[in-house]
Amino acid sequence: MNGRLDRATVFVDADNTLWDTDAVFAESQLALLEAVEAGVGRRTAAADRLAFLRAIDQALAERHHARLRYPPRLLVRATELALGGIDGDSAARAAWRGGQTYRLSDDQAGDIERRFFETLAHAPEIRPGVLIGLSALEQAGCLLLIVTEGAKAKVERNAERVGVAQFFERIIEGPKAPELYRRVLSFTGAPARAFMVGDQLDRDITPAKTAGLRTIFFPGGFQPRWTPAVEQVRPDYTIASFDEVPDIVLGQRRATAAGSKA
């Protein structure tokens, strides 16, 4: 990557920033709930079925080092326990400890987990303003990089599916720590203007802000319950559509250029 000092670098998160991964997860989770209900012969009485399942989901994630990337079979087991009448936190705790007696066999649980992954592989929908925003940034000569903690191959596949792969010079896979941004910027020529666009305040905005980037918060549909408040993180900008990004990036670049000539 050969950068120029006056070239803006824009890091962009993938899931729930470029495309709506949350909707795919919701579809997968509701299908999992229905399969567990069918297997044990019980249904939740909760009016909001997705909220019922996601309470269990987040309780499991809080206990696992990979957070929301914990093995889905744990969700199958905890959901069965919750359908037996205990609350989501208690069900997650019991499934995590192990040693429980389940109605679903290991083969049944494995089949539900397999179908969960199959549904999770469905193509996501692109988020509002993404194509317009990326086109404008590309035409302005910005260096565009995807940064993700997910699997690079899956991000590449989804970028092709929604038609945005051609805008990005590189997909960077790794933990979103401040050091990652600093290291990449050293290769791009440490431009005066560097930005991060993301939907997660703790995973996208905070580390980028610590590294000195301008941060653009593009809220998605789902925020885990451990997410800090916007007022605590204080992103530089908050947008409702990705097509707002070019005005922010290019406006800041013009302001910097004017200041350097003063």
Tell me the role of every PLM-derived stretch.
Residues M1-V10, D107, L131-A262:
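Asp-based, Mg2+/Mn2+-dependent phosphohydrolase catalytic module
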Residues F25-E37, P72-E80, K152:
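An amphipathic alpha-helix signature
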Residues A38-R43, G85, D89, G163-F167:
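Short helix-capping segments at alpha-helix termini
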Residues A123-R127, T148:
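Conserved beta-strand/loop elements of the cytosolic catalytic core of P-type E1-E2 ATPases, chiefly
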